[in-house]
Amino acid sequence: AAAAYIAETGRGWLESLTIVKEVFTEADQILPKSIPGSLFKGSLEVLKYLSQAGIKLGILSADNITAVQNFIKYYQLNDYIQIAMGVNDSPSKPDPKLFLQACQKLGVKPVRALMVGDSPTDIEMGRKAGAAGCIGIYWGKAEANYLQGADVAIANLEEIKVF
């Protein structure tokens, strides 16, 4: 989300992502993380719903695996998330290897998987990996132009339904 804000100032997405990574890396060295990032409103309920529907779920993050595992533990998502991967598991987004490795570990072909993400690099990763589709999530912001490569853009996870 921080990279999206920087990109809105006119910088390119990859430049914005690089700036954010550098800033957060420096901040992580100075300040200890006591609480992981926030869980968006309604996310827990949607994860429960999708898990109960038999959907295999994973978190693929540009953060390191320790931070991802701390996030899952803090928000008690272990019952819903089958795989968690961070950048120290694989090259970072938008490289498709992260998505492909997750699909392999889940026993799911990429053409049978969806990528749900809130950044252009999420969407690009899904496209490059051959995902069945890419859902961009803009978390209710006024504009979702930065997700233009997605098959569909949604305001929140609650818009995802299983039929």
Put a short name on every predicted segment.
Residues L44-Q52, C103, I123-K128:
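Surface-exposed amphipathic alpha-helices with a cationic face
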Residues K93-I123:
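Conserved Lys-Pro-Asp/Glu-containing loop-to-beta segment of HAD-superfamily phosphomonoesterases
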Residues N78-Q82, K109:
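Conserved H-loop
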